[in-house]
Each structure stands twice: as C-alpha cells, then as structure tokens.
Amino acid sequence: MSNKPFHYQAPFPLKKDDTEYYLLTSEHVSVSEFEGQEILKVAPEALTLLARQAFHDASFMLRPAHQQQVADILRDPEASENDKYVALQFLRNSDIAAKGVLPTCQDTGTAIIVGKKGQRVWTGGGDEAALARGVYNTYIEDNLRYSQNAPLDMYKEVNTGTNLPAQIDLYAVDGDEYKFLCIAKGGGSANKTYLYQETKALLTPGKLKNYLVEKMRTLGTAACPPYHIAFVIGGTSAETNLKTVKLASAKYYDELPTEGNEHGQAFRDVELEKELLIEAQNLGLGAQFGGKYFAHDIRVIRLPRHGASCPVGMGVSCSADRNIKAKINRQGIWIEKLEHNPGKYIPEELRKAGEGEAVRVDLNRPMKEILAQLSQYPVSTRLSLNGTIIVGRDIAHAKLKERMDNGEGLPQYIKDHPIYYAGPAKTPEGYASGSLGPTTAGRMDSYVDQLQAQGGSMIMLAKGNRSQQVTDACKKHGGFYLGSIGGPAAVLAQGSIKSLECVEYPELGMEAIWKIEVEDFPAFILVDDKGNDFFQQIQLTQCTRCVK
C-alpha cells in the first residue's frame, strides 16, 4: 500500500454565502489588538440578542424562497385541488403569523443552535449560557409553546416551563466572524429522521435510486408536507451522517460542490435530486391529501465512508421550514432576512376566505347522530366542523389508558365529543386560543381500539396517515379518523377556534386535556366505519399504475 503526501481537505467546502441579512444592532461588539492581530470582542449580550431575535423571526416568518415554492403550487396545472387547497392555507397561515402574535405552528419546537466561532473572536466564555438566555427570552416573551420534558427519574417527567434546554453545538473555525444556524425543530419533522446501516452493495445506479424512493414513501404525511427532503449517503460515522441530514434539510449545504474528489470532499448529486423529486411527485401522496406536491425539493449529499460501513440518512424540514442564519462581525449582529409580507404570494382572486364545497357537521348533537352523518360520505370528503371538540395528545391518552386499566372507565367528555390530537401554544391577549394545529396521529394508534371499545374516541381529528390497527378498530366499533391540515395553526386559532378551556390535568401544560368550540373547522374523512383508508387507496392507485 503506497503512501500519499499529506493533504488537508475541508470536509464541506462551501461557496460564498449569498444569504441576505439585516443589521440588528452594531452594539456589543468591538475590535481590539492582540499580538499584532485584530480581535473581534463580542459581549454576552450580543449572543443573547442574536438568539432572541433569530428564534422570534423563525417562529413567525419563513424564507422567501420557501414561500415562493408554496405559491408556485397554486399556478401548477398538474397540482391536485387538494394540493392547491393546502398551499393556500399555508400562505394564509403565514400571512397571519407574520404579524408576530400567533406563531406559524403550535409546535414551536426544540431550539437548536449550530455556531462556528472564528479563532479571532473573543467572548470571555459562557457562550452556551448567553445563547440559552436568548432562547429563554423568546419563549417566555412570545406566544410560543413549552415542549421540553425533563426526566425526574427514568419514568417520571415534568415540563421545564421554559422550553429549555436548547441544543447548542459550537465549533472552532478560522476567521474573525461568529456564524450561526438556528433551527426551531418540531417533533413531527424531527421524528422523520432515520439512519439505515447499509453496505457497498447498495451503491449501484440500479439499486440506490429505488432504495431511496422506498424509504421516501415511508415518510408518509404525518410531518406536514410538502417537505424539503434530505438524503445523505456515507459518512465517517453514523452521527456525522445524521448531522449532515439535519443541516442539508435546512439548505445549509446547498453550495457544496457537485462532484467528489480523491480527498473525500462532500458533494451534492443534483441529477439524482431531480430524479427523486419526480419520483416524489409520482407517489400520489401530495400535500397531505393526495396529489403531486409531496416535496418541494430534495437534497442528496455523498460523503466519504469507512470501507466496512455505508450509513444512509433521511430527514425532512416540514412546511414550517423554520431555519434562519445569523452572524456577528465587526459591523454588528446580523440576522437572515425572512419574508415579512407573505400575503403578496396569495393571488388576488384567492384572497377571500371562501373554502369551496364542504359538508357542514354539527358536533353539538348526540355522538350517534354525528357518526350516522359521517357514514353517508366516502373517504376524502371535505368537512366543516362546528361545535365542541376535546383536545388531548400523548400524556392525556396515557392517563385515559391508566383509568381504563384500573377499571375506572372513561370520562363522559371523551364519549360525547370528538377528540383533537393537539397541544396549544400560549394564548395571546385578546384571542380565544393560541396557535393550535394538529399533532401526529400515529403516536396514539395503540390506544384507539381500547378507547373505542368503551365508547370513547369515536371521532379522532389529527394529521397524517395511520396504521392498520386504527382502520380495523374504526370498522369494528363504527368510528372515524378525520384529517386536519398539518401546519396552518395560526389560521385555525384566528378563524376557527372560538374558545379554549382546560378540562383536566392543568399541571401538564400543553399536554393537558382541553375543550374548544369551533366554527368552520376544516377536516377530511381519512378513515371511515367501513374499513376504508384514504392513504391505502392512494397506494393502491399508485401500485395499479406501476403494474400498467
């Protein structure tokens, strides 16, 4: 084995950053000299201000390029009516959220900060604490949600009440700037991050593409498509692979080279990206309820690997594409410019709030009457819900199961009303509710049969596809699963939710059981009482096309 001369290869060689920034302030930074070199001195207040503003902006606004992609769906003749309906709701939601009161999504996420600190930047230490203070200030002062649970022991948890801890990863680099990527990562999209340990045998044109298409299909719709999908093939370790997935889904590596070299530089395979995007469009899942727009775009990054390993990673950034860059240099603190006026992307003829044909459902009736009405319509029927809905999610369902297991039976409210899987953000002053969109339905699948057997949870409302056990339970017990659009939580809070009150377990915060009154709350029948599943029908349609 011959030796080669030393050559250092930057693993992720990026071109110039063309991101558009705005100056937050020129305070809290200064320039000094040490041993003949100019040093950028950054006060802790600068880090706190940067984190505070970045997470505020990302909670209420999205990138212009993302908004343009959503708007393009409305003009695409190949987009389904459901694609266009969902896209319009996203734009309306962004228009409301950009006012800075109701956040884009009720799951205001885990705060993730990736920082790269130049060697000629001095802060005096305590960077993580200063950044965490900024995250704290954002979540305390804005109408966001506290989603972090701290373990007291292996099984008992308590909500931290601040949305801390944040995930803060800081790196030392060359230069005299301090650069950041801030991500508000919701649970739905975070849960769609996967690592597969494969081998060299996968790395053939005939196998790799089909493999990635099948993995892409497993994403389903629970994480609020259209997605920004990222695949990473290779990596010097599993953790390097998944870190790259996260950053690629945030467009952080868009300026990588498009070919590799003998030293192991990362690169994008743009041709494979194009091919996979076409395959995503052909899946038929569309923007949640069937159609073309399962993905806005796809990134495929190839990394070097150990000869015995071939990690493959997959992840997404969802319709709440909350990624924002920031930096500190000698001019001051800079924040990436997001879209302040998303309403401009809504065509004039679609500015009025009319939703077209929908079946009106009065929920303030006996459950048997509501079920009988729903039974008249096929899956995919669009509904307009009006009346009382119970709101409960993961811990609430665990509490209800505990009651059933102890022989206590179910509370009457879970029998009399539909249940909406959700957890509200803080309620702004003068509003009936904070942002309150649906959470992922699949996490509650294991509870459905037991609940419905006791007359509860007969109508469920949430987002995304569900497992066969839910379809079987609904057929057995006469229940329904209704789909709500994942993503436009601000629209629902402003337009559909008229009141919100806690019913039980207030100590659980957003995981408590709530009651809401709604008007014209949009939903679709996804699973009915006859064993029909909307998403299974889409898959069968696609399989039939493949056979032909």
Swiss-Prot record:
Keywords on record: 4Fe-4S, Iron, Iron-sulfur, Isomerase, Lyase, Metal-binding, Tricarboxylic acid cycle
E.C. designation(s): 4.2.1.2, 5.3.2.2
Protein's GO biological process: tricarboxylic acid cycle
InterPro entries per UniProt: Class-I_Fumarase/Tartrate_DH, Fe-S_hydro-lyase_TtdA-typ_cat, Fe-S_hydro-lyase_TtdB-typ_cat, Fe-S_hydroAse_TtdB_cat_sf, Fe_dep_fumarate_hydratase, Fumarate_lyase_CS
Activity control, per UniProt: Is inactivated by oxygen, due to oxidation of the Fe-S cluster to its [3Fe-4S] form. Both the fumarase and the isomerase reactions are competitively inhibited by 3-hydroxy-2-nitropropionate. The isomerase reaction is also inhibited by fumarate and malate.
Reactions the enzyme catalyzes: (S)-malate = fumarate + H2O; oxaloacetate = enol-oxaloacetate
Cofactor(s) recorded in Swiss-Prot or TrEMBL: [4Fe-4S] cluster
GO MF annotations, alphabetized: 4 iron, 4 sulfur cluster binding; fumarate hydratase activity; identical protein binding; metal ion binding; oxaloacetate tautomerase activity; protein homodimerization activity
Pfam family, one: Fumerase
Cellular component, GO annotation: cytosol
Induction field: Is expressed under aerobic conditions. Is repressed by glucose and anaerobiosis.
Cofactor binding note: Binds 1 [4Fe-4S] cluster per subunit.
Residues that, per the record, bind [4Fe-4S] cluster: C105, C224, C318
Family matches, as SUPFAM superfamilies: FumA C-terminal domain-like
Pathway recorded for this protein: Carbohydrate metabolism; tricarboxylic acid cycle; (S)-malate from fumarate: step 1/1
Subunit structure: Homodimer.
Sequence similarity: Belongs to the class-I fumarase family.
Function (record text): Catalyzes the reversible hydration of fumarate to (S)-malate. Functions as an aerobic enzyme in the direction of malate formation as part of the citric acid cycle. Accounts for about 80% of the fumarase activity when the bacteria grow aerobically. To a lesser extent, also displays D-tartrate dehydratase activity in vitro, but is not able to convert (R)-malate, L-tartrate or meso-tartrate. Can also catalyze the isomerization of enol- to keto-oxaloacetate.
UniProt name for this protein: Fumarate hydratase class I, aerobic
